Amino acid sequence: MGILEQLELDYELEEIERFLYFFRSLCDVLEPLIVKLSSDSLKYKEALKDLEQNIHNVVWAAKRLNLDEIANFCTFCEEIMQEAAKFDGPASDEFVDWMFLVGEQLDRYCSDYEKNVSFLSVFNPQIANVPDRISK
């Protein structure tokens, strides 16, 4: 039984669809927002706000379905976005590279649900190495 099928047994379809919608929406905007982080100070702040809001939506939906691994990872990402918001920007190259790793992980997780695989993809341990320099 796949992870999506298990959710369908335990939760209302509307809740699952909302989670998948928020998750896919986040993954669809991640790359352009990450690129925007490195543009200038104004775009940096806008991108962080959009990222934080999209991530927050996934956290909310994942918690409603008791998807702790997704909720915890996205909460971690949300906290990093809040920390990054303390800087003026633009983002450092190291932070942009790290954000692309995060984006790849989120996209893998989202695809896992969409493809109804048996287990979530393995977590990339490099993500635990948050760069020291967030802003240039």
Model-predicted regions and their roles:
Residues M1-K136:
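Non-catalytic helical tethers at domain boundaries
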